[in-house]
Amino acid sequence: MADLEHVRWIRRPELRRPHVIAAFTGWNDAADAASTAVKHLVENLGAAPLAEINPEEFTDFATIRPHVRLNSDSTRHIVWPTVSLWSVTSDDVDLILVLGPEPALRWKLFCEQIVSVAREYNASTLISLGALLADVPHRHETQVLGTATDQALIDAHDLQRSRYEGPTGIVGVLNDTAHSAGFSTASLWAAVPAYAAQIPSPKAASALIERLSEIVGCDAPTMMLDAQAALYEEQIDDLISNDPSMALYLDRLENRSDDDDYDEDDYDEDDDMPSYGVSPDQLSFEGMDDAPPLSGPLPDEPVDSDALMEEVEQFLRSQHDD
């Protein structure tokens, strides 16, 4: 196991067997749900900066570019895309929150840095958050699937054991590295509507936080996300109401979802790509395809998913500007 050579400590507080909660933007973060969830925790749990992972070894800066910012005196500085860590202390539970872009290079070494921080604090568990695209309606309750490697964790929190084989993102490598180092690991995945793939989903973020809170025992407020989720639903409803073919498709999708009786055997569960009672070709991670596929019973006039996605994005941007 690597040492902490790529970790830049900001402060080193005392923590009591913290849970490490990690999310990364990119491939495993459909509709920004996982990263939004951790960002919300940072902003609402009194999180304090703990450390940063030096991005130089792990980032392709031609893909994720640094930004130039102006200081108050008009001088400039560069903000580098960095994975940051925060600490949270409370009477009930301590946390280490990890958030940043999925690294492009040297994944094993990167994950060893995170796991070394977990070892430094004798962490109790490492839990990754993710989100995937699926044929689910935006009006329905967000489905969250949890998987784990430790049988006690599975039994205590109604999680499932992974049986997935296939491509993985950084969360899969991180969980494997942590498990190999002796840590209990778990993953929580939220399903977001494929037809609104590029629209940030506060609804899915809230669902992830609620499920996470049940496992780690923290009281994380979600009122702000829930209010944003209500607006998110209303805006998409307004847009779809002006498109009869899409309204018909959504109605059929909702009816199909209402008829589905999900149980443990319906899931192809994993740290990387769980399946919510649908076939693998009905799922797509953000960034894998230019347009996530729509499947299931279609209306008489096929829905152009590219055009719909662009229309949804333009509509929500215009609502934000208003």
Language-model features: locations:
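Flexible, glycine/proline-enriched loop segments at strand-loop-helix junctions
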Residues: 24-28, 98-107, 157-165, 195-199
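Short coil/turn connectors at secondary-structure junctions
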Residues: 15-19, 92-95, 121-124, 139-140, ...
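Internal, conserved structured core segments that host functional sites
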Residues: 93, 101-152, 174
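Hydrophobic/aromatic beta-strand patches that form the interior of the parallel beta-sheet core
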Residues: 51, 96-98, 127, 184-189
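A conserved C-terminal secondary-structure "cap"
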Residues: 196-322
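N-terminal short beta-loop-beta anion/metal-coordinating cradle
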Residues: 1-100
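Catalytic cores of processing enzymes, dominated by hydrolases/peptidases
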Residues: 135-215, 219
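Conserved active-site and cofactor/substrate-binding residues in soluble primary-metabolism enzymes
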Residues: 29-36, 105, 109, 165, ...
